[in-house]
Amino acid sequence: MTATLRRAGVTTQLVTDHPHLFETGGENYHTEFTAWDYQRGHEGDTWKTRPDPSWAGAPSFGRGHTLYDNSRGWFRDEADFPGPRTMTAAASWLRDHAPFHRDAGVPWLLFVDEFDPHEPFDTPEPWASRYDPEWDASVDGPHLIWPPYTGSGVGSGAISERQGRQIRAQYGAKLSMIDHWLGRVLDQLDAGNWWDDTVVIVCTDHGHYLGERDAWGKPGIPLFEPLLHTPLFISWPGVSVPGSTVDALTTNVDLHATLCEAFGVDAPTRAHGTSLRPLLDGSATSVREWALAGVWGREVHVLDRTRKYARAPRGDNAPLSMWSNRWSTMPLHSFPELRMPPPDDRATLDRMPGSKIPVIRQPFVPGDLLPFWAHAERMETLCFDLAEDPGEERNLVGTPAEAELDDLLRTALLEIDAPSDQLERLGLT
């Protein structure tokens, strides 16, 4: 997207504290921006080599977090945390740079990739005690800022019910703190009179389980609504109606096409998104019939306006392949102990849909070591009518609804030119 806009003469600025963008596997897409600003120290950012000795860290439930402990000691007050620094930098860019581009008649994109409210759910007071004032550090220990990743937290004994309440409270604290600092950006939009000629989009990539179904974090289970259903806010002067709500199926893929339309730029022909402008101006009530979601090697999900279908792979989860244009950029280093196999002599060069050159294709068979993100505590086929059953309690597998969504999933995969292996793996051939 940024490369397309930059070629069209749009100034693009990235402001972020998202550490994964700058790791091996991040693909260096930040270099496509006109300029980028990285605020250091979130989660596992390799920023500092030693911690403040007065900071002992917090319980990690078996996962080491030395990198964050090293960074955390350098946050002297709330404004030093990565989230507040990111929002401050974004507001400063709006104040100090955006007016120059407006006066010069140069369109601009400010992309604020804020990692919060991601774990660690670490905040200073008064946020830390705001939603659980009864937590006594002298008795209960430090605030719990690292949630476990499990499909059975309390049930398995990974955490107690009391610890679960504390984790939810710390998530709320992190959410409230970053919401407060996001207000600084919105205040600057007010101060610069930007609302009349600026499209503002607020979205996120995924949710976080906080005890729903006793799931915590982002474990290897199907994508239920708390993780999959994300918020989206758009203000488009002269197009959207302030304060209105649109009941339509959208996906983050659509934001690419939406931004291209906002800037008057043609989207690449192979892009899968659809502009959301017709929903905003009222000229349409729907822009897509389906949306896809999933995690490599696990279930593939398809949704229409009212239903969701998670189809698990059949039998031995084969054929399964991983495709990469540069295996050396795969995130091997992120969690080397959590299984990321190198390619072997079965790897071949093959073409992915839309690729102009062959890429590495590594097949996997039952018994192979799989990447850590493909780990599944359980895989199952699920079908829900979200309009009638928003809590996803009644599995409609075996009903006519499943047959209809089988057909829809097959149609969607064919429409995006998914490899034939994907349909075979899911038993859709």
Show which residues each predicted segment covers:
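A short beta-strand-to-alpha-helix junction
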Residues: 165-177, 219-230, 240-257, 263-274
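Histidine-centered active-site microenvironments of extracellular/periplasmic hydrolases
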Residues: 120-133, 188-247, 251
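Polar, surface-exposed loop/tail segments
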Residues: 21, 83, 87, 196-198, ...
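Short catalytic/ligand-binding loop motif for oxyanion handling, primarily in non-cytosolic enzymes
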Residues: 13-14, 20-26, 44-47, 116-123, ...
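Active-site regions of oxyanion-processing enzymes, predominantly non-cytosolic
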Residues: 23-37, 71, 76-138, 190-199, ...
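C-terminal, low-complexity/hydrophilic appendages and adjacent surface loops
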Residues: 224-225, 295-397
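Catalytic-site neighborhoods of secreted/periplasmic enzymes
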Residues: 1-76, 295
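A long, amphipathic alpha-helix that forms part
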Residues: 81-102, 138, 152-198, 262, ...
